[in-house]
Amino acid sequence: MGKVESFELDHTKVKAPYVRLITVEEGQKGDKISNFDLRLVQPNENAIPTGGLHTIEHLLAGLLRDRIDGYIDCSPFGCRTGFHLLVWGTPSTTDVAKALKESLEEIRDNITWEDVPGTTIESCGNYRDHSLFSAKQWSRDILEKGISDDPFERHVVE
């Protein structure tokens, strides 16, 4: 079985919330895709409940797309502590952390239920499992700690 970088990471040494560049893959024609670890809560200490995580996922799909050129996808970790973010090119962890911070601020401060995309039976595979209340609470808690652009040393972005 191939090695998975995320499983090689010592989860006891990281300090969430943070943004970490996992890898940059280069295609046959030189195109680059960056994979980021958007870790919102400390591994093995907490996990975001599925309803809140699901709603954050749906909102980040649009909010990060508006803030990061080359956005491809943002998918939750199975452990429910954060997300993988895939983008074309090589944005800095600082730029990604700032975009994440702005997006979580938008969720915390401005988003209403009507703003949450994909909440119908036609548009979501598990449309009943959403919680804007939870998404707002978790966004608030994450922002209170600050988002670092370094996973091992706290360097909170403004």
Swiss-Prot record:
The keyword Lyase is assigned to this record: yes
InterPro entries in the cross-refs: LuxS_sf, Metalloenz_LuxS/M16, S-ribosylhomocysteinase
GO MF term set: iron ion binding; S-ribosylhomocysteine lyase activity
Keyword presence, Ribonucleoprotein: no
Known cofactor(s): Fe cation
Residue spans crossing the bilayer: none
Name the record gives this protein: S-ribosylhomocysteine lyase
Organism: Lactobacillus johnsonii (strain CNCM I-12250 / La1 / NCC 533)
Lineage: Bacteria, Bacillati, Bacillota, Bacilli, Lactobacillales
